[in-house]
Amino acid sequence: MDAVTVNNFFLIGAVLVGMSILVSSLSSRLGIPILVIFLAVGMIAGNDGVGGIVFDNYPMAYLVGNLALAVILLDGGLRTRVSSFRVALWPALSLATLGVLVTTGLTGIAAAWLFDLHWMEGLLIGAIVGSTDAAAVFSLLGGKGLNERVTATLEIESGSNDPMAVFLTVTLIEMLASGQTGLSWGFALHLVQQFGLGALLGLGGGWLLLQLINRMHLAGGLYPLLVISGGLLVFALANAVGGSGILAIYLCGLLLGNRPIRSRHGILHMLDGMAWLAQIGMFLVLGLLVTPHDLWPIALPALALALWMILVARPLSVLIGLIPFRAFHDREKAFIAWVGLRGAVPIILAVFPLMAGLPNAQLFFNVAFFIVLVSLLVQGTSLPWAARLLRVVVPPDPAPISRAGLEIHPTSEWELFVYHLNKEKWCIGAALRELKMPGGTRIAALFRGTELLHPSGSTILEADDILCVIGHEHDLPALGKLFSQAPDRGLGARFFGDFVLEGDAQLSAVASLYGLKLDGIDGEQALGRFIAHEIGGEAVIGDQVEWNGLTWTVAALEGNRIRKVGVKFPEGRPGPGLFL
């Protein structure tokens, strides 16, 4: 490779990445998932597009795809709160195993019939597109304000279902290549090995990496690089010994993100940029890899298969996978079924048959690519609409306009929160001493216009003041009630109900106040405890229960305890305006 070729490579790469970033603003304007934009840029620059770039290096695409996916999963694990496992671990694992099997089987049967393939080749297509994609899920669910049970289930599922899809794909390729037509006990053993070794190496490697980071004294910019290199080492080791590298690096990130770690905010800041670069690079390469004119001959059967998977296979897999978990409402199940987003993973898995030289391998790749495109365009584009229709959106928590980490000591979790006080805030005109600040928080600075003031207890807050507060992440809900942009009160009233009651209120008192019948229910118990029992599992904000013709909504939690409950009356039946 001469100097001119290298320079052209840099030139083309920079132009494509830059174009992807610049046109990404179209995503929100057009309501199209940003991943589709990146994929489209690659296709436009490819063989059939205006760029005319010929790229058919499948091993290179496999390398780029795996590297990018590893970085995205590491970043996703770092940002996943382990508290979300409280409500979603077992349901997500059920969907990641049983759900993938059901989706693979149903999609495989349809694929074999639509494309006139052997049943094992049909199952191979089903396995390739059987898992939801972490990159797509993390990208499209971020900032949508979905309730915790739905968000956590989808994110954990997408981070843990790839091992099953990879295992099924590799096993079916080996069987097709060797002419084998039956399954053996080694099938189940290999699956246990994938999950077991992946989990062991992910958690073990994450713990060792955590100890190393907290004991090393390095330049600040080197800690994120150490996390990335350590995560990739865990990913590669797990793959080398027969485990799931994808699961391993996700769990490695999960452990690092939920423990005190040196330079936390620097690590998260850099990983955010690296994850974006990984998504752009991966979808650009996959867009370059496909030849659009090859998709037209299979468009109709591939569209039928995509719709079968979206409307039949995925909903049935969710319905079966969530049978043991009664805490899920039908509307939550429906939303989870709809958000079975496919992304880069199926396209990467579709490269496996090409590298193995299987007959019909190009067909498998084209079908997988078409299904991913339909999934992102149909499911991804309609996600906000589906969330509102199925009522899984909860009013957003108020948030500071910016936040930054304070590295006071190696594993410091102190942060600086910045709040803008507009004229609608109730605290305007109040003295600082009148504010009920959460314990352990301090107002560090106050800006008025361009002037820095020294805040004291007698300082009167004015409109457009900027407050800088030092605290911890768990202080954000309380601080939000004081300073942050006020949430839409109309939205809150529509969602949580006409009145909000204390969860500790005695059920008999609530029944007496609203004229409700207990019908043998223990009236001495707290309202929150009764609602939790009716939900049937771990409660999340936004959970709803119908009782005595009224809608009761979980409005606030304190740990696992329901702290506040909203009550909504039928139209035309107002209730007493009393807060218990």
From Swiss-Prot:
> How is this protein named in the record?
K(+)/H(+) antiporter NhaP2
Purpose:
K(+)/H(+) antiporter that extrudes potassium in exchange for external protons and maintains the internal concentration of potassium under toxic levels.
Question: Which molecular function terms from Gene Ontology are attached?
Answer: flavin adenine dinucleotide binding; potassium:proton antiporter activity
Tell me the PROSITE patterns matching this sequence: RCK_C
Q: Which gene encodes it?
A: nhaP2
Q: What is the lineage of its organism?
A: Bacteria, Pseudomonadati, Pseudomonadota, Gammaproteobacteria, Pseudomonadales
Q: Which PANTHER family match?
A: K(+)_H(+) ANTIPORTER NHAP2, NA(+)/H(+) ANTIPORTER 1
Quote the InterPro entries the UniProt record gives.
Answer: Cation/H_exchanger_TM (IPR006153), FAD-bd_PCMH-like_sf (IPR036318), FAD-bd_PCMH_sub2 (IPR016169), Na+/solute_symporter_sf (IPR038770), NhaP2 (IPR023729), RCK_C (IPR006037), RCK_C_sf (IPR036721), Transptr-assoc_dom (IPR005170)
Please list the residue ranges annotated as the RCK C-terminal domain.
403-485
Q: What is its main location?
A: membrane
Query: Per the similarity annotation, which family is this?
Result: Belongs to the monovalent cation:proton antiporter 1 (CPA1) transporter (TC 2.A.36) family. NhaP2 subfamily.
* GO CC terms: plasma membrane
Kindly state which reaction or reactions the protein catalyses.
K(+)(in) + H(+)(out) = K(+)(out) + H(+)(in)
Q: Does the keyword Cell inner membrane apply?
A: yes
What is the recorded membrane topology of this protein? Multi-pass membrane protein
Keyword set, alphabetical order? Antiport, Cell inner membrane, Cell membrane, Ion transport, Membrane, Potassium, Potassium transport, Transmembrane, Transmembrane helix, Transport
